[in-house]
Amino acid sequence: TDKYMHGILNKDWGLLPPKAVLSHLVLMEHPNYPKLLVYGDMAVIPLPEFKQKVAIVKYAAGVCKELGIAQPKIAMIAATEQMLPAMLACTEAAQIAKMSERGQVPGIVDGPLALDVAISPECAKIKKLKSEVAGDADALVFPNIESANVFYKTNTQLMKGVKTAAVVVGAAA
């Protein structure tokens, strides 16, 4: 991975355009989830700033559209689905969800959503959340690299039958 990323980031001959956002997305097939799931960033951006989160949403929507999902449902993951001003993940998720309502980002974006609410219809029902995304997410955007990486490793190391593919997005071809 280090050599691969070094080649992409090389200033003389690399593939990263100026001011571009490079990100890492995973496509996961999970035996306990009814459809493919796209998520990120789990390997490139340690603590995405707001503009980087918007870029990750756009990249995730693009991957979903390539998979034939015309209006991908994208969950902005946080520790809670409550709008807590003290938690940056919550406030930025709410802002990006509002951008989605206005057509400023692709897909149907909702957040903040706790992970259980994003992927479990039962949890969404118990918590009485009215959302097109809750319980039916096509993509998850995590607030930081730690949470995305733990999600990836928990699923790939503790679950049998999980299949993944990863891609670095944002580079020029």
Which residue ranges define each predicted feature?
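Anion-binding alpha/beta catalytic cores of soluble intermediary-metabolism enzymes, centered on
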Residues: 1-133, 138-143, 147-173
